[in-house]
């Protein structure tokens, strides 16, 4: 669904990504793993248009969207959820969900909110609370619920389980699977919890120093020597 | 004395409420730190002194020097107004229309240089632009008479002097009420919610498909158009304009204090903030020398109002940053209907 070709990107004059080639398949979960500072989050930000692209192409539905600004990418049904700052803290949960629907037809918004609440029933009891008062898990539910309200086709998640307990992280992973299976979402996932993320994924990429060090199916990546070294914190010389 | 005091409080409440409501939309709702708010008020003065006065010169066939010419023109129109009150009301409406249009355009242009700026950088850029325009208007005699100033029509030339303050205060209050209704109607909508969202998190607003710059332009254009109305009213009240009357202290910083005091993102809260501050400030200005002698204050009491400003700002930001009346969720008409249904059951 999204093809990345020879992508070079960074922040201002600081280049982070070097000659990245990748393919995110429609209706699949693709996980990006790698050590801190490897460019995983920058990769997501670049796809969404929040970094400076020096060269390369991002092909989505047969069009190069590398130079398309974020708000137009959003209207192309691409949703990006940063690790933090992904909700409006001073607005209520209900208001957050409504705002997510502002690019849709009025009739459709109500329907989409009901769908979001069916996937995240935990939100029903807290609709009147300010988003800033939610726990970490509730906040992630809200952020992902907002993506569902928008009727997104591609969902890019940047470490959605960061700072959550293992039990809650597992719930998040289950929701991600549910969104892929029930709504056919294409999901691109950046996770520090690499092993578990790959276990729920279809495909995987390993980034090292801003380059793709390995790509393949999630299973292949799980069994790769490089990944084992990375998981154990061993650096081969 | 007390009667005049009340009319003065009402007048300043009305003027500052108009400015503060528009600042509340820009800063309280949209999160735009418009430290150049004084510019929109100055634009109202320019509409009256720079455009309306020229139209009057044209109408009465008066040529020659701008400053002198407008003196003759305003004398002529005042004579006309004295015998035809309708003309005065017409001048007021014309001035408001001119100012709103000019304010709208200037507001839209004013925000453009800051396309990539945020927060402090955005605020300081707007302040700098505002100051630059004020300096130009102060030293260029052909805009609003520079440091000499310029005459403006007395739209209440048909009212005797002793009642003029009262009548003008009620006109200002009426217009302030209309502005309040306008903002309540404009901001209790999905648009208002998007502005609040933009204040919270611009990247997430982009992520939901909205163009931040368009929202800023729209917000600043509307905010400046309304701010310019206050400039018109002030210029017509004083029946003259001098550029130095439109300083950042009076028309940017005081409104910020009033918005924060009353409660940003909340139009009723702003009313309370404006009322509290205006009462204290007017009383302080009038009785500052009585206070000096009563308390044995060892310095010039003219500084008391600035000290009050500083102390209040620190107290608000430290102890109650949400203001006297904190903001509430935006209730759009459909939500209101739903609430009525639920409570009706």
UniProtKB/Swiss-Prot annotation, chain A:
GO terms of biological process kind: branched-chain amino acid transport; L-amino acid transport
Database matches in InterPro entries? AAA+_ATPase (IPR003593), ABC_transporter-like_ATP-bd (IPR003439), BCAA_Transport_ATP-bd_LivF (IPR052156), P-loop_NTPase (IPR027417)
ABC transporter domain ranges (all copies)? 2-234
Which GO molecular-function terms appear in the entry? ATP binding; ATP hydrolysis activity
Which superkingdom, per the lineage? Archaea
- Residues that, per the record, bind ATP: 34-41
Taken from the record, one Pfam family name reads ABC_tran
**Which key words are in the record?**
Amino-acid transport, ATP-binding, Nucleotide-binding, Transport
Family per UniProt? Belongs to the ABC transporter superfamily.
Sum up the protein's function in the record's words. Answer: Probable component of a branched-chain amino-acid transport system.
| Name of the featured protein | Probable branched-chain amino acid transport ATP-binding protein LivF
From Swiss-Prot, chain B:
Which Pfam families does UniProt cross-reference here? BPD_transp_2 (PF02653)
Q: Where in the cell is it found?
A: Cell membrane
> Can the keyword Cytoplasm be found in this entry's annotation?
no
Membrane topology type: Multi-pass membrane protein
Q: Which UniProt keywords apply?
A: Amino-acid transport, Cell membrane, Membrane, Transmembrane, Transmembrane helix, Transport
Q: Does the keyword Mitochondrion apply?
A: no
So where does this one cross the membrane? 3-23, 42-62, 91-111, 124-144, 163-183, 222-242, 269-289, 297-317
Name any one GO molecular function.
branched-chain amino acid transmembrane transporter activity
Gene Ontology terms, cellular component aspect? plasma membrane
Chief localisation class: membrane
> In its UniProt record, which GO terms are filed under biological process?
amino acid transport
Q: Cross-referenced InterPro entries, in alphabetical order?
A: ABC_transp_permease, LivM-like
What function is annotated for this protein?
Part of the binding-protein-dependent transport system for branched-chain amino acids. Probably responsible for the translocation of the substrates across the membrane.
**What family is this protein classified in?**
Belongs to the binding-protein-dependent transport system permease family. LivHM subfamily.
- What this protein is called in its record is Probable branched-chain amino acid transport permease protein LivM
């Amino acid at each position: 669904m999204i093809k990345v070709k020879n992508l070079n990107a960074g922040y201002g004059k600081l280049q982070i990504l070097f000659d990245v080639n990748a393919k995110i398949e429609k209706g699949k979960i693709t996980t990006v793993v790698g050590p801190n500072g490897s460019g995983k989050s920058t990769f997501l930000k670049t796809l969404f248009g929040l970094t400076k692209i020096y060269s390369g192409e991002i092909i989505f539905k047969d069009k190069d969207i590398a130079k398309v600004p974020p708000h137009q990418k959003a209207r192309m049904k691409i949703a990006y959820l940063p690790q933090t700052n992904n909700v409006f803290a001073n607005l209520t949960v209900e208001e957050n969900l409504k705002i997510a629907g502002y690019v849709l037809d009025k009739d459709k918004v109500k329907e989409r909110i009901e769908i979001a609440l069916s996937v995240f029933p935990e939100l029903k009891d807290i609709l009147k609370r300010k988003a800033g008062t939610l726990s970490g898990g509730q906040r992630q539910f809200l952020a992902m619920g907002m993506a569902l309200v928008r009727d997104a086709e591609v969902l890019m998640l940047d470490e959605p389980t960061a700072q959550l307990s293992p039990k809650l992280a597992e719930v998040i992973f289950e929701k991600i699977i549910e969104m892929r299976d029930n709504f056919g979402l294409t999901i691109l996932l950046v996770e520090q919890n690499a092993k578990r993320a790959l276990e729920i994924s279809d495909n995987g990429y390993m980034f090292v120093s801003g380059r793709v060090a390995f790509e393949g199916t999630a299973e292949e990546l799980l069994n790769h020597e490089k990944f084992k070294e990375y998981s154990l914190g061993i650096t081969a010389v | 004395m007390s009667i005049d005091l009340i009319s003065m409080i009402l007048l300043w409440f009305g003027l500052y409420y108009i400015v503060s409501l528009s600042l509340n939309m820009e800063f309280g709702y949209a999160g735009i730190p418009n430290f150049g708010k004084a510019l929109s008020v100055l634009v109202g003065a320019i509409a009256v002194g720079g455009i309306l006065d020229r139209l009057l010169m044209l109408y009465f066939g008066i040529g020659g020097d701008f400053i002198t010419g407008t003196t003759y023109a305003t004398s002529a129109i005042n004579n006309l107004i004295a015998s035809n009150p309708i003309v005065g009301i017409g001048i007021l409406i014309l001035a408001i229309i001119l100012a709103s249009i000019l304010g709208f355009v200037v507001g839209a242009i004013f925000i453009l240089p800051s396309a990539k700026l945020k927060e402090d950088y955005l605020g300081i850029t707007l302040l700098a632009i505002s100051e630059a325009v004020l300096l130009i208007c102060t030293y260029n005699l052909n805009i609003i008479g520079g440091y000499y100033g310029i005459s403006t029509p007395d739209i209440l030339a048909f009212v005797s002097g002793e009642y003029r303050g009262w009548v003008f205060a009620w006109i200002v209050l009426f217009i302030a009420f209309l502005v309040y209704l306008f903002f309540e109607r404009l901001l209790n909508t999905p648009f208002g919610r998007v502005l609040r969202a933009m204040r919270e998190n611009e990247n997430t607003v982009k992520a939901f498909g909205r163009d931040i710059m368009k929202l800023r332009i729209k917000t600043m254009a509307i905010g400046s158009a309304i701010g310019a109305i206050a400039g018109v009213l002030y210029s017509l009240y004083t029946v003259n304009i001098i550029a130095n009357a439109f300083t950042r202290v009076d028309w940017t910083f005081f409104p910020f204090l009033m918005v924060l005091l009353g409660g940003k993102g909340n139009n009723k809260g702003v009313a309370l903030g404006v009322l509290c501050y205006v009462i204290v400030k007017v009383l302080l200005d009038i009785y500052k020398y009585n206070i000096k002698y009563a308390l044995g204050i060892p310095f010039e009491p003219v500084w008391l109002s600035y000290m009050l400003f500083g102390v209040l700002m620190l107290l608000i930001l430290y102890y109650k940053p949400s203001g006297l009346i904190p903001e509430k969720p935006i209730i759009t008409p459909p939500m209101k209907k739903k609430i009525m249904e639920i409570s009706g059951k």
